[in-house]
Amino acid sequence: MKHLKLILSILFIFCLTRTYADDSNYLFRHYQVENGLSDNMATCCVQDRKGYIWIGTRDGLNRFDGYTFKVFRNDPDETETLGSNWITCLGCDMNGDLWVGTLSGLYQYDDEKESFRHIPFTADKGIDIFQFDKDNKLWILMDGNLIRFNTEDSQFRIFAPEDNQSYTTFCITRENSIWIGSSDGLISLLNPEDETMESYNVFAHSSPNTPRKLSMLYPSPTTDRIYIAFEHDDVKIFDPATRDYQDLNIQKINQLTILINSFLEKDKDELWIGTDSGLFIYKINTGECTRIRQDPLDPYALSSHFISAFCRDRENGIWICFHQNGLNYYSPFRPFHVHYPWDGQYSMKGEVIRDICTDIYGNIWVGTEDAGINCLEKKTETFTNYQPVPGGNGLSHTNIRGLAASGDRLWIGHVIHGIDLMDIKTRKVIKHYNLLKDSLTVKNSTVRCIKVLQEGQVYVGTDDGIYKYDFLNDRFLYAPQFPPFAVNCIYEDRLGRIWTGMFNRSFYYNPISNTGMYLPYDKLNTQRHNFVNDACEDKDGNMWFATVEGVIKYDFQTGESLHYTVKNGMPSNVAFRILPDENETLWISTANGLVSLETGTGKITTYTESHGLITRQFNDNSAFKDNEGTFYFGSVKGFIHFKPSEVIPAAEKMNVHLGSLEIQNEAGEKRIINSSAESEANLNNS
């Protein structure tokens, strides 16, 4: 029996999230031919009624479902196919159905058959622009003429310009008014009934000898403004109510010549301008203009300077098409401050984050597995990197396994290299400590975690058990009160008990009574091969454990345990760290996203790249909560920090589409399924 693989493509299912985070940190996700895009020259982009993102290129039409690209190209052996692979423009009618402009005419997409119907009168014509009005009439700019096409009866009407002129652009406003731009610098209001025009000179009070060809009109979706780009020059804002205009002088402000290719009004006070020299963000109220540019050293910067088009999706995400560098996505959900390595002078070094802590000065210390320690300086907001230094005063090794700050001291744990102690003021390592179980041991225990307790005691979890700092003799001593097993975490509960996470079990020690007790796998109702990675206590005194078999809640009163796994909402069974907030919610890092779990209701919300994460893959022992309530989580590509109160998720109904059928890992041919493999189901994001 053949193995059938059904791929459920979840179309841009994002939790709606309100955020108050700083919006100045622009991060972009990149899609290029390596990710499945047919060609890196992306010309246009649109989202259809089902949520698919369609991208036009010079080598076919791409449909993106959030995971994979499906490419539609010209097929000479098929009658209902695109006539040209060069896509010039895309749009949807009032029903949300897709229409495609190409160098060989206009096509209507049939999503059931996944075929394209050619509009006959556009044969062999390049389609410059098209747009639907509120009556679902299609307006097309073709050969310098404006054409109105009735999609119901296929009748069309041509609106031709006066002699020696040509229409260069047009737009339809939210009031359903048709405005046309021409090569002589006029913007004209068309009355379709009697074909009359009201024309206005948008150069009446501008500098003389300015090129007058209007290249683009973009109607504001929120106000009565029309944004105007004119050839090889600048931007104007036209007010249809007053029939007057304003010059923005973008080029003068930035002292460079730009080619304007696209507009997008992010909100009523912010205009995005796509040019051949990067992204310009213009604040309507203040006139402030910010330029966002490509940085080849930054993996999350713009892919290129040359922007060709914008598209806003239904979640207010912004897709950016580039002339030669594919597609970028900008997420509107910005609850997380993101830090990642790149080659800048004051950037973070190393990708794999192993531990995080803050000091009394507000600096953030980040230990990596591949580049020593980074300090995010509070005063300058820049990173300083610390690695081994020949001759002393440096780290023992670049592979950091534990960090903890205590006053002016920073405790640094290594793999088989013991503990370094750094003076935070001087930034020098002032002493090194060995971790030896007894006088016969010659090899240091490998550090897994470091914990400074409420009373200031320093505990170190290692592969061989627990070590405790001896203040009197300035050394670390092996603590026989704890089992001699590898310790993944150390946690102090409200009663002062010290919890450790181990293989197959958790153990807690009571320093007051000098007694301890195991909480083995059978009491936790879990598998024998489980690992406890972290532990924490909720307000009711229940213990929560992050394990490789999910998250476990243990009730001391009843002795019962409750499991959270992929079967009941977790994105992964591998949970690394748990941080509780002030609202009875646990924040959990996993191998497949960041989770918030409401302890009262059990509701799980997962955060991924769609919410601004740089990766879903978090890391062991890499989380911290500072005194101001800021949470830090480390991943294999950097770290994030945020305040839970600024992340407010809301449930959203979402569609799931069966987008393709695979047989033995290969897509099904048309002879297997005669119509599109799409089917729909409604889910509640809870």
Residue ranges and their predicted role:
Residues 65-68, 110-114, 150-154, 191-195, ...:
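Short loop/turn segments that connect beta-strands within beta-propeller blades
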Residues 129, 154, 195, 225, ...:
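Coil residues (strongly favoring Ser/Thr
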Residues 47-50, 92-95, 132-135, 172-175, ...:
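Residue-level detector of Asp-centered blade-edge/turn motifs that repeat once per structural unit
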Residues 19-53, 74-87, 123-125, 163-164, ...:
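Residue-level "micro-hotspots" composed of small/polar
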Residues 1-27, 45, 52, 179, ...:
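Bacterial Sec-dependent N-terminal signal peptides
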Residues 52-54, 97-99, 137-139, 177-179, ...:
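Conserved beta-propeller blade signature
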Residues 26-33, 68-74, 114-122, 154-162, ...:
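Trp- and S/T/G-rich repeat-edge/linker motifs of beta-rich repeat architectures
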Residues 59-61, 104-107, 143-147, 183-187, ...:
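Loop/turn residues immediately N-terminal
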